[in-house]
């Protein structure tokens, strides 16, 4: 389970790297390719998250609790926090 968590962290780091490079270029094709790669890494995160759910049943419970806490705090749309 720890190795899967580490792999998830690595995928998030890769996403950040590809998106940072994509944001830094004005070359439309390069930007599109880099964003596509970042999106593939996001799919990997989803695969790893599903694997964690299978290996650690408490994972889903913890995620559900976290979502509920955000909902209760009135922060249903987290992205609004970062756009203001």
Regions found by a protein language model. Name each.
Residues 1-84:
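Iron-associated oxidoreductase/ferritin-like identity signal
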